[in-house]
Curated annotation (Swiss-Prot):
Belongs to the UPF0346 family. Gene3D superfamilies: YozE SAM-like (1.10.150.260). NCBIfam families: PRK13672.1 (NF010193). Pfam families: YozE_SAM_like. It comes from Geobacillus kaustophilus (strain HTA426). This is UPF0346 protein GK1571. InterPro entries: UPF0346 (IPR010673), YozE_SAM-like (IPR023089), YozE_SAM-like_sf (IPR036806). It comes from the Bacteria. SUPFAM superfamilies: YozE-like (SSF140652).
Length: 72
């Protein structure tokens, strides 16, 4: 089974709070409705556009998504 984006994102949780990636990871961790098992870009981006108040910019997600695909 492929690792979910959420599992990938958690590796960034403990870092400098000024980093938007760290804030995204911490926000997703605190978001109990985040689609934790998803590996689908459309599902994740749609969810974040509607519910990701903790995400500074969708660019942060898009860049992490590219890294996730590269490392998967």
């Amino acid at each position: 089974m492929a690792k979910s984006f959420y599992r990938y994102l958690l590796r960034f949780r403990h870092g400098h709070q000024e980093d938007p990636v760290v804030r995204f990871a911490n926000g997703a961790y605190e978001d109990h409705s985040f689609p934790k098992g998803s590996t689908d870009y459309e599902e994740l981006s749609g969810y974040l556009e509607l519910n990701g108040d903790y995400l500074e910019s969708m660019v942060v997600f898009d860049e992490l998504w590219e890294q996730f695909l590269h490392e998967a």
